[in-house]
Amino acid sequence: MLQTEMKVIQQTEIADKVYELILSGECVADMSPGQFLMLKPSRSDLLMRRPISICSYDKTAKTCILLYRVEGDGTKDFSSLSKGDSIDVLGPLGKGFDLNTIPAPKTALLIGGGIGVPPMYQLGKELADKGVQVTFVNGFQSEKDSFYEKEMTEYGTVHIATVDGSYGTQGFVTDITKNFPEEPDVIYSCGPKAMLQAVKASFPETKTYLSLEERMACGIGACYACVCPKAGDTKKQFKVCEDGPVFRADEVSL
């Protein structure tokens, strides 16, 4: 973990209220798939940092890409950043997808929902680099909300679901996965809790890893704002920012 200043290389709105922010900094060297950064807004009245998942990184160039949706004052503040600006960053944080301890799969299904799609990109890239056959299934509310389909096709097959049916399959990600003829060796998923519950229920026998989305205040496990009950004993809790955000599906009670 490192508190540092990162430099803005570029920022672009790539979908409705969704921004691609490219940053440069030394902390990129420590990044792994599934981790996140805590960004500090520039406005003095916004005291809390905001957690943003890491979409991708290039350790040689010392750059990373963050994708975020403008939903409140903090993310609105970030959207005003432009080339050459600096931003106060804490990270990289959290335990991401540890590909070294997972038996090498032949096939992997990566399921993302909304702003849970970004961390699937770097994960898919690294799995593909290992020779894994990657399938992405991304869910959005509407076509105007969708992003990164073209980028993901470089590393695997991409399927899109939209709730309103304006693009891809109408419905949810599970409306796509239920028609797959074979189950994958491993599943990785990030998105809203309802989606993660559906993914977990749809693949009870498949090794599944979930990246949880919870509101965070400190990002380092000190404030207990982002707890999640443990499976089998809901009186015990995980701190999502410190123990996760990635967990085995059988570890957590959603």
Swiss-Prot record:
Extract one GO BP annotation from the record.
'de novo' UMP biosynthetic process
Electron transport is among the record's keywords: yes
Detail which positions bind FAD.
R50, P51, I52, S53, L67, Y68, R69, G74, T75
Q: How is the cofactor bound?
A: Binds 1 [2Fe-2S] cluster per subunit.
The superkingdom of the source organism is Bacteria
Query: What are the record keywords, sorted?
Result: 2Fe-2S, Electron transport, FAD, Flavoprotein, Iron, Iron-sulfur, Metal-binding, Pyrimidine biosynthesis, Transport
Write the signal peptide boundaries.
Answer: none
Gene3D superfamilies of this UniProt entry?
Dihydroorotate dehydrogenase, electron transfer subunit, Nucleotide-binding domain of ferredoxin-NADP reductase (FNR) module, Translation factors
Residue ranges constituting the FAD-binding FR-type domain according to the UniProt record: 1-99
Q: Molecular function terms in GO for this entry?
A: 2 iron, 2 sulfur cluster binding; electron transfer activity; flavin adenine dinucleotide binding; metal ion binding; oxidoreductase activity
Protein residues bound to [2Fe-2S] cluster: C218, C223, C226, C241
Cofactor(s) required, per the database record: [2Fe-2S] cluster; FAD
Q: Which residues form a coiled coil?
A: none
| PROSITE patterns named among the record's database cross-references | FAD_FR (PS51384)
Matching entries from InterPro entries are given as:
Cyt_c3_hydrogenase_gsu (IPR012165), Dihydroorotate_DH_ele_sf (IPR037117), Dihydroorotate_DH_Fe-S-bd (IPR019480), Dihydroorotate_DHASE_ETsu (IPR023455), FAD-bd_FR_type (IPR017927), FNR_nucleotide-bd (IPR039261), OxRdtase_FAD/NAD-bd (IPR001433), PyrK_electron_transfer (IPR050353)
Q: In which pathway does it act?
A: Pyrimidine metabolism; UMP biosynthesis via de novo pathway; orotate from (S)-dihydroorotate (NAD(+) route): step 1/1
**UniProt KW Nucleotide-binding keyword:** no
Question: PANTHER family per the record?
Answer: DIHYDROOROTATE DEHYDROGENASE B (NAD(+)), ELECTRON TRANSFER SUBUNIT, DIHYDROOROTATE DEHYDROGENASE B (NAD(+)), ELECTRON TRANSFER SUBUNIT-RELATED
Q: Which family does it belong to?
A: Belongs to the PyrK family.
Quaternary structure (record): Heterotetramer of 2 PyrK and 2 PyrD type B subunits.
Instruction: Quote the function comment for this protein.
Output: Responsible for channeling the electrons from the oxidation of dihydroorotate from the FMN redox center in the PyrD type B subunit to the ultimate electron acceptor NAD(+).
Q: What is this protein called?
A: Dihydroorotate dehydrogenase B (NAD(+)), electron transfer subunit
Q: Which organism is it from?
A: Listeria innocua serovar 6a (strain ATCC BAA-680 / CLIP 11262)
The organism's taxonomy opens as: Bacteria, Bacillati, Bacillota, Bacilli, Bacillales
Q: Which gene specifies this protein's sequence?
A: pyrK
